[in-house]
Amino acid sequence: MKKLSVFVKDRRKEVRMTQKEFAERAGVALTVVRKIEQGKTNLNLDKVNLVLAMFGHEMAPAASIELESTDEAS
């Protein structure tokens, strides 16, 4: 599975856009595109989806799963 940062950067380069041009077209700040391409993890999902919409994709949060403790001493 491709990392989000690699996917966005590769697709942006395929359409021959600078980060600034791409950000303007996607309707997000330049810093959003930079953070995504740098692999930052503290991103706003709505902003990420504005970027992914440029390629016909969307991201959704994954369900959180709690693991049971196997520690018998507790």
Predicted regions and their residues:
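Residues that mark the N-terminal boundary/hinge immediately upstream of a DNA-recognition element
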Residues: 7, 18, 44-47
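Short alpha-helical DNA-recognition segment
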Residues: 16-34
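DNA major-groove recognition helix of helix-turn-helix/homeodomain DNA-binding modules
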Residues: 46-62
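Short, charged recognition helix plus adjacent turn
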Residues: 60-74
